[in-house]
Amino acid sequence: MSQWRGLLQEYKEFLPVTEETPLLTLGEGNTPLIPLENLSKEWGVKAYVKYEGANPTGSFKDRGMVMAVAKAKEEGSRTIICASTGNTSAAAAAYGARAGLRCIVVIPEGKIALGKLAQAVMYGAEVLEIKGNFDHALDIVRSISEKEPITLVNSVNPYRIEGQKTSAFEICDALGQAPDVLAIPVGNAGNITAYWKGFKEYHEKKGTGLPQMRGFEAEGAAAIVRNQVIEEPETIATAIRIGNPASWTYAVEAAAESNGKIDEVTDEEILAAYQLLAQKEGVFAEPASCASIAGLRKQIASGEIKKGSTVVCVLTGNGLKDPNTAMSTIDVNPAVLPNDEQAFLDHIKGGVPK
């Protein structure tokens, strides 16, 4: 069995890789497509999750970042910069470290999961906090990158989209064709853009078919659904707490071209899906990821997703990215028992399986 060589080598023919592009990798890609056996029976569909939390820094951002950082290095850049709600900063810092580049990340004040911040710090990034939200941070780093010899690695960087589209290839490779529906969280909207690009390119080359693209924003940050910029977006799903998505137009096009839809889910629906996925399937994803599961559940109930459909839900990040949400949404009160085996047996026998 040959070792996975990373995206720049495995999907070279579909990527802007030249003889001069450094073949940077941390082993990103090749993430599992997990069938949801229990929930599929309950909902009457063939549901899978594309578990992007298995990437090196724990999120889908690694796919785009390896491409963006490799091209930055190829072009002679010495510094990369990004605005981030967390996952982008972790990926940029890791691949920046691997490539030997200086990395600067700008985060919204007090609005980032600690697991993600810890990663950026450990990888050696310079972390700056802005007194504002993600959209303010992105405005500043975009402006700086236009004036200084610093490479912006947010999803407005076209190389990010190129790397992220590879997940669509992997889904088609695993299933033998595209699913009927691709359900995906929408924050800055780069990922839905990338998946649609990937499905179209693979279909053109291999005849794998095209899915409906169904994207899900959090209700408190549903700029595309409401067709207006949300000045102060708010949601428990910090990774998609974005009120002015950079790839807004492309996301709308992806939904329209594929006969899909951009929809919204509430924080309550997201948290219910977050717990359901972990407790019914043993898959722990960060809250924002579970917008795709919440959306699937919502649209099965509404009849928009038909029974019997093959659906892939993208889980964008690992649950360990945001342990605080898990601890704050579920009561953690372990029973304290004496150091006595019989006491444990009595307790266990008295318990009723969930």
From Swiss-Prot:
Keyword flag Amino-acid biosynthesis: yes
Annotated S-S bridges: none
Keywords: Amino-acid biosynthesis, Lyase, Pyridoxal phosphate, Threonine biosynthesis
Pfam families in the cross-refs: PALP
Gene3D superfamilies membership: 3.40.50.1100
Protein name as annotated: Threonine synthase
GO molecular-function term, one example from the UniProt record: pyridoxal phosphate binding
Catalytic activity: O-phospho-L-homoserine + H2O = L-threonine + phosphate
Keyword Amino-acid biosynthesis: yes
GO biological process: isoleucine biosynthetic process; L-serine catabolic process; threonine biosynthetic process; threonine catabolic process
Source species taxonomy: Bacteria, Bacillati, Bacillota, Bacilli, Bacillales
